[in-house]
């Protein structure tokens, strides 16, 4: 079975979103991913909903995550520890870092 693509990961985010875990989060997260499957995505978490926009760069996001697409995919799929990826600068974060700490909890990962 082929490995999931980055686009599929983003497409699945709204259905994997756990509003009960996110609570009253109100944030826009900009993803800048480089490499073979790279691109720009904006994920808005607001009013207990998750909205994903493809091929967009937003002004003044709450947080920006920059990474190689494969490294990001490895974190999401549990093949790479998120904290280790951050410490090794494979994931670069700018903005509200508390949001980054909670982000993985807001989504069903199976």
Language-model segments: which ranges?
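Feature captures hydrophobic
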Residues: 1-110
């Amino acid at each position: 079975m082929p490995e999931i693509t980055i686009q599929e990961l983003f497409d699945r985010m709204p259905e994997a979103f756990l509003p009960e875990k996110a609570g009253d989060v109100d944030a826009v997260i900009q993803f800048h991913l480089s490499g073979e499957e790279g691109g720009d995505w904006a994920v808005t978490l607001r009013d207990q909903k998750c909205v994903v926009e493809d091929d967009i760069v937003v002004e003044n996001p709450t947080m920006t995550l920059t990474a190689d697409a494969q490294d990001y995919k490895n974190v999401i799929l549990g093949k790479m520890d998120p904290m280790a990826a951050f410490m090794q600068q494979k994931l670069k974060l700018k903005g509200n870092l508390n949001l980054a700490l909670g982000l993985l909890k807001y989504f069903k990962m199976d």
